[in-house]
């Protein structure tokens, strides 16, 4: 039986499994200071054209979101996100449990607009009792979104411009980023590094056993980030297992190949549904498909 409920029902791609087996008995330093993590960082910096970025490897998406937001925000600040966002709907209140409110914005397709962000922040700042309300200080978007939709390059550029004008931090959750990169008109890794304060490159949903690579451009977020990783339970002792996987994913374009295959396979499913007259809840070009059930 073929199952379709998520991106992580199998183990890892053969290239990663082979390297894990080949290097299994090597002895390296722990906690991400090994040669494999260093090599992976350099490959990602090159791919992003971001040689001033700090790169950290974490095990999963919720852990990455929690750690980044904790590092970026002060206690009185919150993060704006779509009402369907992963940090709002699928992380068991992890962000709020550690002291930061998720400020939700309305959405019809999983995306939020620069105009809505700007309007919310300006309303907050115009409120005479603003200091009694959580201060909006970060914008969180995922690429793709929870509905499978994607931000185009112009949309992300507009969000980035508004965030910079208003002094907000822009954070992109890239748990499914390889699929977005395979879609036409979407921001590249170099665009993300240019437009965002921080983002991460998902591995768990794209052929790795586990792992997300956090790319930090904002110097304020870089400060003491490893302390914050450790405090939030994210300092993986056998860190080389993360580095080795990302080193493999960024060898010979493997990360991009995986995303293209995922999107292509989903396209076959989409076409089969459409041939039967079945419609979709959202206009998703990625591998997240939401067919609307029909009765005959």
Regions found by a protein language model. Give the residues of each.
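Conserved PLP-enzyme active-site core in the AAT-like
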Residues: 2-294
């Amino acid at each position: 039986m073929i199952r379709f409920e998520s991106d992580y029902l199998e183990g890892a791609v053969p290239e990663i499994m082979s390297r894990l087996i080949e290097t299994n008995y090597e002895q390296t330093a722990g906690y991400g200071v090994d040669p494999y993590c260093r090599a992976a960082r350099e490959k990602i910096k090159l791919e992003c054209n971001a040689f001033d970025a700090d790169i950290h490897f974490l095990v999963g998406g919720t852990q990455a979101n929690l750690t980044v937001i904790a590092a970026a925000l002060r206690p009185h600040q919150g993060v704006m996100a779509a009402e369907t966002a992963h940090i709002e709907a699928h992380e068991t209140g992890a962000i709020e449990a550690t002291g930061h409110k998720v400020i939700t914005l309305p959405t019809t397709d999983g995306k939020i607009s620069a105009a809505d962000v700007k309007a919310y922040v300006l309303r907050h700042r115009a409120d005479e009792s603003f200091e009694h309300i959580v201060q909006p200080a970060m914008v969180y978007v995922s690429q793709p979104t929870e509905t499978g939709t994607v931000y185009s390059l112009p949309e992300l550029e507009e969000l980035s411009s508004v965030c910079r004008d208003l002094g907000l931090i822009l954070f992109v959750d890239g748990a499914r980023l390889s699929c977005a990169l395979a879609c036409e008109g979407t921001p590249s890794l170099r665009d993300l590094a240019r437009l965002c304060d921080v983002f991460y490159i998902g591995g768990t949903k794209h052929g790795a056993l586990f792992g997300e690579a956090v790319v930090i451009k904002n110097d304020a977020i870089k400060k003491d980030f490893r302390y914050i990783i450790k405090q939030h339970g994210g300092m993986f002792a056998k860190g080389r297992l993360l580095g080795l996987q990302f080193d493999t994913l960024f060898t010979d374009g493997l990360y991009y190949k995986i995303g293209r295959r995922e999107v292509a396979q989903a396209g076959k499913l989409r076409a089969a549904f459409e041939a039967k007259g079945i419609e979709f809840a959202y206009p998703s070009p990625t591998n997240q498909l939401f067919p609307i059930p029909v009765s005959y």
